[in-house]
From Swiss-Prot:
Compartments, record wording: Cytoplasm
Segments forming domain SH3: 91-161
SMART domains: GuKc, PDZ, SH3
Organism: Rattus norvegicus
Keywords: Coiled coil, Cytoplasm, SH3 domain
Coiled coil regions, renumbered to chain: 373-430
Name of the protein described by the UniProt record: MAGUK p55 subfamily member 4
Tissue specificity comment: Highly expressed in brain and detected in lung, and bone (at protein level). Also expressed in intestine and spleen.
A Pfam family annotated for this UniProt entry: Guanylate_kin
Entries under InterPro entries matching the protein: GK/Ca_channel_bsu, Guanylate_kin-like_dom, Guanylate_kinase_CS, MAGUK, MPP4_SH3, P-loop_NTPase, PDZ, PDZ_sf
């Protein structure tokens, strides 16, 4: 038997306990990384508790033992029977981007709710312990000083996703937004919506990838810094129609065309008399265009007045090969097609300001469509823009590297230039597959 003395402070002890299913013994279930118990180094997972501050724990429930600990102040004395062989830690720290939201308070399966770590889509997590197949220990890099918390393992979340998926009634393939309620914390990050017409052409792509497999809840990431000899990263602008994405892209390229350039799109229509192949468009046959589509070499595509239009991976690479920064706008559901090792996109979400700000800044702005010319923004248009932005951020925010609120076009352009400079010059979190030798993206 061993006596362990801990001085309790304002922080949790950093350990969980459980009752052995057969013997009824109270055991240390796990030691939380960075907590008081781990720093003390005298209690290990598997140790049997005999006494706490002189009170025998035999026959007590774990909740009763926790109550004794909660009522204790200052020094806490444990009498324990050590595990026969203390675990040897050989954990490798891994960093991941969360692709889902997680709330421990809404998870009935978590072993200890108080030890749970809540996180949101896009958060970068440092996973410090994967020894448990179901519950990992992690901390947010924004709160690296605090002790770790419990998060569901990749295996557990995927299992929950599959169980949820198969428990739902069959619905026809509609490509409409998912009707999942907010309470379900294990969303798969693949809920989509109809984004409406783009000004150039309607997107004919099935927007939801609703026949695809369950998405990975975590994406392993590493720090990446572009070197001078490397190609520039593709800059992707995303935002609801009317927020100013096209205008920002146009102004960005116009302010420095030797640095920034758009990719030349492809089309199946015939060139007009004043057009030149490779300048306005790459003019190709429908067969060639569809071959690029089915080969996943089209980042975006759509059909307009019977003709196909789209931007290919090769067209983007042609700009990057010239040593320029390629800037393009994408619908959010197309971001994943661009997230490859060869393009390494930096995704910037252009977000509308408040309704009152939009009424002021866009009171003289016009909507130009195929049906109306110089149609002013109405409150319904602004409301739709705001709601669409919220949906984009909610469903695709894990892919956004930076967010700019376009309250003022001049300020937004300055922020855009600054964000691109940081993407080019500073360390950024990117998928591990983008930089690992021999990895496939």
């Amino acid at each position: 038997m061993r006596t362990v003395c801990l001085v309790k402070n304002q922080q949790p002890l950093g350990a969980t306990i459980k009752r052995h299913e057969i013997t009824g013994d109270i055991l240390v279930a796990r030691v939380i990384h960075g907590g008081l118990v781990e720093r003390n180094g005298l209690l290990y997972a598997g140790d049997k508790l005999v006494e706490v501050n002189g009170v025998p724990v035999e026959g007590l429930d774990p909740e009763q033992v926790i109550h004794i600990l909660a009522m204790s102040c200052g020094t806490i004395m444990f009498k324990v029977i050590p595990v026969s062989a203390p675990p040897v830690s050989s954990q490798t720290t891994v960093y991941v981007r969360a692709m889902i939201d997680y709330w421990p308070q809404e998870d009935p399966d978590i072993p200890c709710m108080d030890a749970g770590l809540p996180f949101l889509k896009g958060d970068i997590l440092q996973i410090v312990d994967q020894s448990d197949a179901l519950w990992w220990q992690a901390r947010k890099i924004s709160d690296i000083a605090i002790c770790a918390g419990l998060i569901p393992s990749n295996h557990l979340l995927k299992r929950k996703q599959r169980e949820f998926w198969w428990s739902q009634p069959y619905q026809p393939h509609t490509c409409l937004k998912s009707t999942r309620s907010k309470e379900e914390f294990v969303g798969d990050g693949q809920q989509f919506f109809i984004a409406g017409f783009r000004q150039q052409h309607a997107n004919m792509r099935c927007t939801c990838s609703c026949y695809s497999a369950v998405g990975a809840p975590y994406e392993e990431v590493v720090r990446y810094q572009r070197q001078p000899a490397d190609k520039h990263r593709l800059i992707v602008l995303v935002g609801p129609s009317g927020v100013g994405v096209n205008e920002l892209r146009r102004q960005l390229i116009g302010c420095n065309p030797s640095c920034f350039q758009s990719a030349v799109p492809h089309t199946t229509r015939s060139p007009k008399s004043y057009e030149m192949d490779g300048r306005e468009y790459h003019y190709v046959s429908r067969e060639t265009f569809e071959s690029l589509m089915y080969g996943h070499r089209m980042l975006e595509f759509g059909e307009y007045k019977g003709h196909l239009y789209g931007t290919s991976v090769n067209a983007v690479l042609a700009v990057l090969d010239e040593g320029k920064i390629c800037v393009m706008d994408l619908e959010p559901q197309d971001i994943q097609l661009a997230r490859t090792r060869e393009l390494k996109p930096y995704v910037i979400f252009i977000k509308p300001p408040s309704m009152s700000s939009m009424r002021h800044s866009r009171r003289n702005a016009k909507i130009i469509t195929d049906y109306f010319v110089d149609m002013k923004f109405k409150d319904e248009d602004l409301q739709e823009m705001e709601e669409l932005a919220q949906k984009m951020e909610s469903q695709f925010g894990q892919f956004f590297d930076h967010v700019i609120v376009n309250d003022n076009l001049q300020d937004a352009r300055a922020q855009l230039l600054s964000a691109i400079q940081k993407a080019e010059e500073e360390l950024q979190w990117v998928p591990e597959a983008w930089v690992s030798p021999g990895a496939e993206s």
